[in-house]
From Swiss-Prot:
Its EC number is 2.7.4.8. This is Guanylate kinase. SMART domains: GuKc (SM00072). One of its GO terms (molecular function) is ATP binding. Pfam families: Guanylate_kin (PF00625). The gene is gmk. It is an enzyme of class 2 (transferase). Residues 2-183 form the Guanylate kinase-like domain.
Amino acid sequence: MTKLIIISAPSGTGKSTVIERLLTDRELNLHFSISATSRAPRGEEQNGREYYFLSPEEFRRRIEANEFVEYEEVYRDKYYGTLKSEVERILKEEKNVIFDVDVVGAQSIKKYYGDRALAIFILPPSIEELRSRLQKRGTDSMETIKQRVDKAEKEIGYAHLFDLRFVNDDLVTCVEQIRKAIAQFIAK
């Protein structure tokens, strides 16, 4: 039976890199679940590659039609969510689904799929290390970094709700630990 792998973590913990590396492991047979959003595409983004881009009206219509496993309005008329049809498409291909979602979305997906889903939370070694990583990126203002760190502290408060937790203090080690945990879960 195909399984669902939910990955959640604060910004700056290496979640995207961990997921990219896991996707290259053929034995895990993972396929990335593309989220839907009502925000406009940025730069080179294409519909169906980075996101499914929907108008706010279309997003709300699909919410009313119960077409989402989970969704959230992060700002006024700026929605993000996971379409049931996207998950079903991947499962029909006999692949395991991997999600990159926030803590609220992770809990919704876990509740919907139950024991068929494994919820993993990636923690930074410390809040100080997280702040340092975000500063080294050089992409955010100090105010944005403060907001991300504040949000991370709140998200870490949800870590106990996840099936497994891993600290990313060494990327290679963290990826290998998560890979082993996923392989064991898939083999059940």
